[in-house]
């Protein structure tokens, strides 16, 4: 079973990732002439995060057999890496200029001359960074669970021998 704090983080992250997926999906769908690998990777990162963190993580909360700390930690770490890389790639692509500067918009591969696309790219960068920080917190929760319960959620320490004596002790 996952801690309730971990599930709350995953619920907030679900909202951020859905918004980021909508924004980046809109950017990918309205690309006019240029190829945008940054946007395509951001769509992948948001979809991968939704699938592995939100859906699998919440499923692991309700079905304890799927709450393997090693799997959750690997997913959280991969999601951290993917969302950080996607947010940084978009941020480097838009180069943080004003979306009202037409000279900048015309020369930018992501904005493609549209201030609306520029604002969508800036917003998707922000939401991907929000998700990145939540993935860091989720990875910390998973690492704590991994250190306490072992790779597959079972403690490596045997249960203490207390209670009623056995027949051989009588």
Swiss-Prot record:
It is a multi-pass membrane protein. Belongs to the NCE102 family. Residues 6-141 form the MARVEL domain. Involved in membrane organization. Involved in a novel pathway of export of proteins that lack a cleavable signal sequence. Non-classical export pathway also functions as an alternative clearance/detoxification pathway to eliminate damaged material, when the basic repair pathway is not sufficient. Regulates actin organization and subsequent morphogenesis and pathogenesis. The keyword RNA-binding does not apply. One of its GO terms (biological process) is eisosome assembly. The chain crosses the membrane at residues 12-32, 39-61, 77-97, 126-146. It comes from the Eukaryota. It comes from Candida albicans (strain SC5314 / ATCC MYA-2876). Residues 33-38, 98-125 are extracellular. This is Non-classical export protein 102. Its main location: membrane. PROSITE patterns: MARVEL. InterPro entries: Marvel, NCE102-like. Residues 1-11, 62-76, 147-170 are cytoplasmic. GO terms for cellular component: eisosome; extracellular vesicle; plasma membrane. Pfam families: MARVEL. The keyword Protein biosynthesis does not apply. Disruption phenotype: Leads to decreased virulence and forms abnormal hyphae in mice. Shows defects in forming hyphae and invading low concentrations of agar but can invade well in higher agar concentrations. It is found in: Cell membrane. Keywords: Cell membrane, Membrane, Protein transport, Transmembrane, Transmembrane helix, Transport, Virulence.
């Amino acid at each position: 079973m996952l801690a309730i704090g971990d599930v709350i983080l995953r619920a907030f992250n679900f909202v951020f990732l859905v918004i980021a997926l909508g924004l980046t999906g809109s950017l990918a769908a309205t690309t006019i002439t240029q190829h945008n690998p940054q946007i395509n990777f951001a769509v992948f990162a948001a979809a991968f995060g939704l699938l592995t963190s939100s859906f699998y993580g919440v499923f692991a909360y309700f079905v304890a057999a799927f709450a393997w700390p090693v799997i959750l930690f690997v997913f959280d770490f991969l999601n951290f890496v993917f969302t950080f890389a996607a947010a940084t790639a978009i941020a480097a692509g838009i180069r943080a200029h004003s979306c009202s500067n037409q000279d900048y918009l015309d020369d930018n591969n992501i904005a493609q001359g549209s201030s609306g696309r520029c604002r969508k790219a800036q917003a998707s960068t922000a939401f991907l960074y929000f998700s990145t920080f939540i993935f860091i917190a989720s990875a910390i929760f998973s690492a704590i669970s991994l250190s306490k319960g072992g790779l597959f959620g079972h403690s490596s320490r045997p249960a203490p021998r207390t209670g009623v004596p056995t027949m051989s002790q009588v």
